[in-house]
A protein has these predicted regions:
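Active-site capping/gating segments
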Residues: 28-32, 37-69
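Conserved beta-strand signature within the Rossmann-like core of class I S-adenosyl-L-methionine
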Residues: 13-31, 43
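Amphipathic alpha-helical interface surfaces
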Residues: 4-5, 33, 58, 89
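Short alpha-helical
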Residues: 3, 28-32, 99
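Active-site segment flanking the S-adenosylmethionine/decSAM binding pocket
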Residues: 1-13
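An accessory alpha-helical subdomain
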Residues: 70-138
């Protein structure tokens, strides 16, 4: 996952420094990986995403570079994927939106509990972020 990618890059930094290019495929915490790369002047020059058997696999080409400006949405979903209006990312975003809205509706029925109300608030923020990403496709 993403945590392991960050650990490998951190512990292996002497090797990272001499590499011209890296291809990374974090399977979780992808936003954290993007943020880590940017904070360490490692620039994502290309991103791709594929889907197989209903699972989505992001990948990125990384070189030494300089820090870039990223929004939270771009860290979360991939600046290059969003700017390119990547079709597989669009499919992922549509699915995420359906899932989040469905969970929100289920929680709405049980909003009396504090934990449901708290999760609903988290979901609202996630839905807003996903909607922001979907605006790239308009």
């Amino acid at each position: 996952g993403g945590g392991l990618v960050i650990k490998i890059l951190t512990e292996g930094y002497p090797v990272v420094e001499i590499l011209d290019t890296m291809i990374l495929q974090p399977q979780s915490e992808i936003g954290k990986v993007r943020r880590f790369l940017n904070e360490h002047n490692l620039q994502i020059t290309e991103e791709n995403m594929v889907e197989e058997d209903g699972k989505f696999y992001p990948m990125m080409k990384v070189i030494h570079g300089k820090k870039e400006e990223y929004t939270i949405c771009e860290y979360t979903y991939g600046k290059r994927l969003l700017l390119e209006q990547h079709p597989v990312l669009k499919k992922y975003l549509d699915r995420e939106m359906q899932i989040k809205e469905s969970v929100f509706q289920q929680l709405f029925k049980h909003q009396n509990s504090a934990s449901a109300a708290e999760r609903m608030e988290e979901l609202k923020q996630e839905i807003i972020l996903t909607q922001e990403a979907l605006k790239y496709y308009e």
